Amino acid sequence: MKIMVINGPNLNLLGIREKEIYGAKDFNQVIDYIKEEGKELGLEVNCFQSNIEGEIINFIHNAYFEKYDGIIINPGAYTHYSIAIYDALKGVEIPTVEVHLSNIHKREEFRHKSVTAPACIGQISGFGEYGYIMAMNALKNHIKSK
């Protein structure tokens, strides 16, 4: 089973940016953790990151053309306003789980709404990097049940 993990803007600053919210592990440590846990689950996991909306959309399109079974996406701030990412996710019809390291519903009001989550089978928010592992388990079970 092939899973694409897409991280959006500013996630490359993990371990630098607002450690009290996002944790002390740097981006590469989080990616290594995701890949290691994915391997344990018997998944082929490929991770991508971009601060550019169009590149994120290209990753989503590539997931379709490269025959990925599922997508895990942390759209970062694009969560709250990117209709283009929503459209890309709807367009490829690949089971997707949206992940957020922090609980977006406990933060500033503008972070409470996700325009991208309705294009996903579910959303996991507030469990730090473990949210990606939860998402991999959820995707694996969802795909197997089809």
From Swiss-Prot:
Keywords: Amino-acid biosynthesis, Aromatic amino acid biosynthesis, Lyase. The keyword Hydrolase does not apply. Its EC number is 4.2.1.10. The active site is at residues 22, 100. It catalyses: 3-dehydroquinate = 3-dehydroshikimate + H2O. The keyword Lyase applies. PROSITE patterns: DEHYDROQUINASE_II. It holds the Pfam family DHquinase_II. GO terms for molecular function: 3-dehydroquinate dehydratase activity. The record marks 17 as: Transition state stabilizer. It is an enzyme of class 4 (lyase). GO terms for biological process: amino acid biosynthetic process; aromatic amino acid family biosynthetic process; chorismate biosynthetic process; quinate catabolic process. InterPro entries: DHquinase_II, DHquinase_II_CS, DHquinase_II_sf. Pathway: Metabolic intermediate biosynthesis; chorismate biosynthesis; chorismate from D-erythrose 4-phosphate and phosphoenolpyruvate: step 3/7. Substrate binds at residues 74, 80, 87, 101-102, 111. HAMAP family: AroQ. Belongs to the type-II 3-dehydroquinase family. NCBIfam families: aroQ, PRK05395.1-2, PRK05395.1-3, PRK05395.1-4. PANTHER family: CATABOLIC 3-DEHYDROQUINASE (PTHR21272:SF3). Homododecamer. Catalyzes a trans-dehydration via an enolate intermediate. This is 3-dehydroquinate dehydratase. It comes from Clostridium perfringens (strain 13 / Type A). The gene is aroQ.
